[in-house]
Curated annotation (Swiss-Prot):
GO terms for cellular component: cytoplasm. GO terms for biological process: queuosine biosynthetic process; tRNA wobble guanine modification. Monomer. It comes from the Bacteria. It catalyses: 7-aminomethyl-7-carbaguanosine(34) in tRNA + S-adenosyl-L-methionine = epoxyqueuosine(34) in tRNA + adenine + L-methionine + 2 H(+). Keywords: Cytoplasm, Queuosine biosynthesis, S-adenosyl-L-methionine, Transferase. PANTHER family: S-ADENOSYLMETHIONINE:TRNA RIBOSYLTRANSFERASE-ISOMERASE. GO terms for molecular function: S-adenosylmethionine:tRNA ribosyltransferase-isomerase activity. It holds the Pfam family Queuosine_synth. It is found in: Cytoplasm. Transfers and isomerizes the ribose moiety from AdoMet to the 7-aminomethyl group of 7-deazaguanine (preQ1-tRNA) to give epoxyqueuosine (oQ-tRNA). InterPro entries: QueA (IPR003699), QueA_dom1 (IPR042118), QueA_dom2 (IPR042119), QueA_sf (IPR036100). It comes from Bacillus cereus (strain Q1). This is S-adenosylmethionine:tRNA ribosyltransferase-isomerase.
Amino acid sequence: MDINLFDFHLPEELIAQVPLEERETSRLMVLDRETGDIEHKHFTDILSYLHEGDCLVLNETKVMPARLHGVKEDPGAHIEVLLLKQEEGDKWETLVKPAKRVKEGTVISFGEGKLKATCTGTADQGGRQLEFSYDGIFYEILDELGEMPLPPYIKETLEDRDRYQTVYAKEIGSAAAPTAGLHFTEELLEKLKQKGVELAFITLHVGLGTFRPVSADTIEEHHMHAEYYHMSEETAALLNRVKENGGRIITVGTTSTRTLETIATDHDGKLCAASGWTDIFMYPGYEFKAIDGLITNFHLPKSTLIMLVSAFANRDNVLHAYNEAVKEKYRFFSFGDAMFVASHAKMGNK
């Protein structure tokens, strides 16, 4: 399948550069995955589309301040490091710029020596394996020296790094935020619980592979980078209970979707406690086994994320919705607006 089938025209001014002042004030497009019908709402209207007995699945990963600026100890050139994945102990898979200046044995110093890294080898797609040395607690030092790893299409400086975290972020380990969750406030989540909507939490640590452009000409030639996921026995039991009682499982974001669909694929359609690495790639033709609805942002043209949404809601429906979003001047990408995609997605229906 040609990746150009997932292209659309996006004016640059619709790429959101900063988050809205209030998380929940973003717009919400509601898309019926069966009919392609569209409604234009605000995010707080999600309360009217979720019902007692439904379950929202949220990814509680926490973004690391994963971008570090350092200098080579000899001869002092500036090096930028982006942490991607912890391998074991203090060894990490990273991206470095400029990569040609970092060879095996190169030592990089950060924060006037508070943190040091030695290159121990190369990694996939031009990456580098670095082993860090420090006194103290690694994540405390990282919190002090690191910057939030905003996507390259965001040019503005982020004033408040908490705005690139969900309010329920807990398990540190992501190189990017699960952005569909950025719209929720603690108050909105509490209102959903009061309505009888269950909240279930999983973890998938987001790597840059999710956002890397598809370089192949056809979808089938593209391979996803693996990302770590975990679902507890408690969450699995809750999801199965919801299913048994006729409720819907609504994933918040493509990361939650990938986690549940990975587990269901690996366990004959069943949801159970599991941990591991997933490189699942969902595009039209994929048959969903676990989810009934999806809350997600508006994604990049020709990205694996728009392919996932197209697998769930039909490519023609999704591209029509995206063209409508452009026409109505929705905000796109990480700090942009949201979609709710489900069957019979009408306000107040059950």
